[in-house]
Protein backbone atom coordinates (compact mmCIF):
# COMPACT_ATOMS: atom_id res chain seq x y z
CA UNK A 1 0.00 0.00 0.00
CA UNK A 2 2.76 2.44 0.99
CA UNK A 3 4.77 1.53 -2.08
CA UNK A 4 1.75 2.20 -4.27
CA UNK A 5 1.14 5.59 -2.69
CA UNK A 6 4.78 6.50 -3.23
CA UNK A 7 4.44 5.41 -6.84
CA UNK A 8 1.34 7.58 -7.27
CA UNK A 9 3.09 10.57 -5.73
CA UNK A 10 6.05 9.95 -8.01
CA UNK A 11 3.70 9.73 -10.97
CA UNK A 12 2.14 13.06 -10.04
CA UNK A 13 5.55 14.70 -9.63
CA UNK A 14 6.75 13.43 -12.99
CA UNK A 15 3.60 14.66 -14.66
CA UNK A 16 3.94 18.01 -12.91
CA UNK A 17 7.33 18.36 -14.54
CA UNK A 18 5.61 17.73 -17.87
CA UNK A 19 2.60 19.91 -17.09
CA UNK A 20 4.20 22.73 -15.16
CA UNK A 21 7.93 23.20 -14.76
CA UNK A 22 9.00 21.88 -18.15
CA UNK A 23 5.82 22.92 -19.87
CA UNK A 24 5.42 23.53 -23.56
CA UNK A 25 4.18 27.05 -24.39
CA UNK A 26 0.66 25.72 -25.03
CA UNK A 27 0.35 24.10 -21.58
CA UNK A 28 0.53 27.14 -19.35
CA UNK A 29 -1.41 30.19 -20.51
CA UNK A 30 0.56 33.33 -19.72
CA UNK A 31 -1.56 35.69 -21.84
CA UNK A 32 -5.34 36.09 -21.99
CA UNK A 33 -7.16 35.48 -25.27
CA UNK A 34 -9.95 37.98 -24.56
CA UNK A 35 -9.80 41.73 -24.06
CA UNK A 36 -9.60 42.75 -20.41
CA UNK A 37 -9.81 45.86 -18.29
CA UNK A 38 -6.50 47.26 -17.04
CA UNK A 39 -7.24 45.91 -13.57
CA UNK A 40 -7.87 42.39 -14.91
CA UNK A 41 -4.78 42.58 -17.13
CA UNK A 42 -2.65 43.33 -14.08
CA UNK A 43 -4.37 40.61 -12.07
CA UNK A 44 -3.76 38.07 -14.86
CA UNK A 45 -0.10 39.10 -15.10
CA UNK A 46 0.40 38.81 -11.32
CA UNK A 47 -1.19 35.37 -11.18
CA UNK A 48 0.86 34.18 -14.16
CA UNK A 49 4.07 35.45 -12.55
CA UNK A 50 3.35 33.62 -9.30
CA UNK A 51 2.64 30.42 -11.23
CA UNK A 52 5.83 30.76 -13.27
CA UNK A 53 7.80 31.11 -10.04
CA UNK A 54 6.19 27.99 -8.60
CA UNK A 55 4.33 29.93 -5.90
CA UNK A 56 1.35 27.60 -6.01
CA UNK A 57 -0.81 28.83 -3.13
CA UNK A 58 -0.62 32.52 -4.00
CA UNK A 59 -1.16 31.77 -7.69
CA UNK A 60 -4.30 29.77 -6.84
CA UNK A 61 -5.67 32.68 -4.80
CA UNK A 62 -5.03 35.16 -7.61
CA UNK A 63 -6.45 32.94 -10.36
CA UNK A 64 -9.61 32.31 -8.34
CA UNK A 65 -9.97 36.05 -7.83
CA UNK A 66 -9.57 36.55 -11.58
CA UNK A 67 -12.07 33.78 -12.28
CA UNK A 68 -14.72 35.47 -10.16
CA UNK A 69 -14.50 38.44 -12.50
CA UNK A 70 -14.02 36.40 -15.69
CA UNK A 71 -15.77 33.01 -15.25
CA UNK A 72 -15.53 32.08 -18.95
CA UNK A 73 -11.74 32.11 -19.17
CA UNK A 74 -10.71 28.63 -20.31
CA UNK A 75 -7.02 29.61 -19.98
CA UNK A 76 -7.46 30.30 -16.28
CA UNK A 77 -9.35 27.03 -15.80
CA UNK A 78 -6.38 25.27 -17.38
CA UNK A 79 -3.86 27.16 -15.24
CA UNK A 80 -5.80 26.41 -12.06
CA UNK A 81 -6.02 22.76 -13.05
CA UNK A 82 -2.25 22.62 -13.43
CA UNK A 83 -1.75 24.22 -10.02
CA UNK A 84 -4.17 21.92 -8.23
CA UNK A 85 -2.61 18.94 -10.00
CA UNK A 86 0.83 20.02 -8.80
CA UNK A 87 -0.60 20.46 -5.30
CA UNK A 88 -1.95 16.86 -5.29
CA UNK A 89 -5.55 18.16 -5.28
CA UNK A 90 -6.64 15.89 -8.09
CA UNK A 91 -10.40 16.32 -7.66
CA UNK A 92 -10.10 20.10 -8.03
CA UNK A 93 -7.72 19.71 -10.97
CA UNK A 94 -10.23 17.46 -12.74
CA UNK A 95 -13.01 19.95 -12.07
CA UNK A 96 -11.15 22.91 -13.57
CA UNK A 97 -9.82 21.01 -16.59
CA UNK A 98 -13.38 19.78 -17.18
CA UNK A 99 -14.86 23.26 -16.88
CA UNK A 100 -12.23 24.59 -19.26
CA UNK A 101 -13.05 21.87 -21.76
CA UNK A 102 -16.73 22.82 -21.63
CA UNK A 103 -15.73 26.36 -22.56
CA UNK A 104 -13.34 25.18 -25.31
CA UNK A 105 -14.35 21.61 -26.33
CA UNK A 106 -11.71 21.29 -29.05
CA UNK A 107 -8.77 22.39 -26.92
CA UNK A 108 -6.42 19.40 -27.12
CA UNK A 109 -4.21 20.59 -24.27
CA UNK A 110 -7.15 20.67 -21.87
CA UNK A 111 -8.15 17.17 -22.98
CA UNK A 112 -4.64 15.86 -22.37
CA UNK A 113 -4.41 17.49 -18.95
CA UNK A 114 -7.83 16.17 -17.95
CA UNK A 115 -6.93 12.65 -19.07
CA UNK A 116 -3.71 12.70 -17.02
CA UNK A 117 -5.56 13.81 -13.91
CA UNK A 118 -8.29 11.20 -14.43
CA UNK A 119 -5.65 8.47 -14.80
CA UNK A 120 -4.13 9.41 -11.46
CA UNK A 121 -7.51 9.45 -9.74
CA UNK A 122 -8.61 6.14 -11.28
CA UNK A 123 -5.36 4.50 -10.12
CA UNK A 124 -5.95 5.71 -6.56
CA UNK A 125 -9.56 4.52 -6.64
CA UNK A 126 -8.51 1.11 -7.94
CA UNK A 127 -5.95 0.75 -5.16
CA UNK A 128 -8.68 1.59 -2.65
CA UNK A 129 -10.90 -1.06 -4.31
CA UNK A 130 -13.44 1.57 -5.30
CA UNK A 131 -13.86 -0.17 -8.63
CA UNK A 132 -17.18 1.39 -9.68
CA UNK A 133 -15.78 4.90 -9.25
CA UNK A 134 -12.57 3.97 -11.06
CA UNK A 135 -14.63 2.66 -14.00
CA UNK A 136 -16.50 5.98 -14.18
CA UNK A 137 -13.17 7.80 -14.57
CA UNK A 138 -11.82 5.29 -17.09
CA UNK A 139 -15.01 5.53 -19.15
CA UNK A 140 -14.53 9.26 -19.26
CA UNK A 141 -10.94 8.76 -20.41
CA UNK A 142 -12.19 6.53 -23.26
CA UNK A 143 -14.44 9.34 -24.48
CA UNK A 144 -11.56 11.83 -24.40
CA UNK A 145 -8.93 9.59 -25.97
CA UNK A 146 -8.13 8.93 -29.64
CA UNK A 147 -9.41 5.65 -31.10
CA UNK A 148 -5.97 3.99 -31.09
CA UNK A 149 -5.75 4.36 -27.29
CA UNK A 150 -9.31 3.37 -26.41
CA UNK A 151 -8.88 -0.41 -26.59
CA UNK A 152 -6.23 -0.52 -23.86
CA UNK A 153 -8.40 1.56 -21.53
CA UNK A 154 -11.44 -0.58 -22.27
CA UNK A 155 -9.42 -3.64 -21.22
CA UNK A 156 -8.69 -1.91 -17.92
CA UNK A 157 -12.42 -1.38 -17.47
CA UNK A 158 -13.13 -5.05 -18.23
CA UNK A 159 -10.51 -6.11 -15.67
CA UNK A 160 -12.22 -3.99 -13.01
CA UNK A 161 -15.62 -5.38 -13.98
CA UNK A 162 -14.14 -8.85 -13.41
CA UNK A 163 -13.07 -7.79 -9.91
CA UNK A 164 -16.54 -6.45 -9.14
CA UNK A 165 -18.19 -9.62 -10.44
CA UNK A 166 -15.98 -11.78 -8.22
CA UNK A 167 -17.39 -9.90 -5.24
CA UNK A 168 -20.92 -10.37 -6.58
CA UNK A 169 -20.43 -14.14 -6.85
CA UNK A 170 -19.10 -14.30 -3.30
CA UNK A 171 -22.20 -12.50 -2.06
CA UNK A 172 -24.52 -15.06 -3.74
CA UNK A 173 -27.20 -12.36 -3.51
CA UNK A 174 -30.00 -11.79 -6.01
CA UNK A 175 -29.84 -8.06 -5.30
CA UNK A 176 -26.09 -7.92 -6.01
CA UNK A 177 -26.48 -9.79 -9.30
CA UNK A 178 -29.32 -7.53 -10.39
CA UNK A 179 -27.37 -4.41 -9.43
CA UNK A 180 -24.35 -5.62 -11.41
CA UNK A 181 -26.51 -6.16 -14.51
CA UNK A 182 -28.04 -2.73 -14.09
CA UNK A 183 -24.59 -1.08 -14.02
CA UNK A 184 -22.79 -3.34 -16.49
CA UNK A 185 -25.31 -4.89 -18.91
CA UNK A 186 -22.62 -5.56 -21.53
CA UNK A 187 -19.69 -6.74 -19.42
CA UNK A 188 -18.01 -9.48 -21.52
CA UNK A 189 -18.80 -12.89 -20.03
CA UNK A 190 -19.90 -11.51 -16.68
CA UNK A 191 -23.26 -10.12 -17.76
CA UNK A 192 -24.33 -13.36 -19.45
CA UNK A 193 -23.27 -15.36 -16.40
CA UNK A 194 -25.23 -13.00 -14.15
CA UNK A 195 -28.36 -13.33 -16.32
CA UNK A 196 -28.09 -17.13 -16.25
CA UNK A 197 -27.64 -17.13 -12.46
CA UNK A 198 -30.72 -14.94 -11.99
CA UNK A 199 -32.74 -17.07 -14.42
CA UNK A 200 -31.78 -20.29 -12.62
CA UNK A 201 -32.59 -18.81 -9.22
CA UNK A 202 -35.99 -17.60 -10.36
CA UNK A 203 -36.72 -20.95 -11.99
CA UNK A 204 -35.72 -22.81 -8.83
CA UNK A 205 -37.92 -20.52 -6.76
CA UNK A 206 -40.84 -21.10 -9.12
CA UNK A 207 -40.41 -24.88 -8.95
CA UNK A 208 -40.15 -24.69 -5.17
CA UNK A 209 -43.41 -22.78 -4.98
CA UNK A 210 -45.12 -25.32 -7.25
CA UNK A 211 -43.92 -28.21 -5.09
CA UNK A 212 -45.17 -26.40 -1.99
CA UNK A 213 -48.59 -25.90 -3.57
CA UNK A 214 -48.67 -29.55 -4.64
CA UNK A 215 -47.80 -30.78 -1.14
CA UNK A 216 -50.52 -28.56 0.34
CA UNK A 217 -53.07 -29.87 -2.18
CA UNK A 218 -52.44 -33.60 -1.63
CA UNK A 219 -53.32 -33.72 2.12
CA UNK A 220 -56.59 -31.94 1.40
CA UNK A 221 -57.52 -34.68 -1.10
CA UNK A 222 -56.66 -37.38 1.41
CA UNK A 223 -58.91 -35.75 3.99
CA UNK A 224 -61.82 -35.78 1.58
How should each PLM-predicted stretch be described?
Residues 79, 113, 120, 154-156, ...:
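Canonical tetratricopeptide repeat
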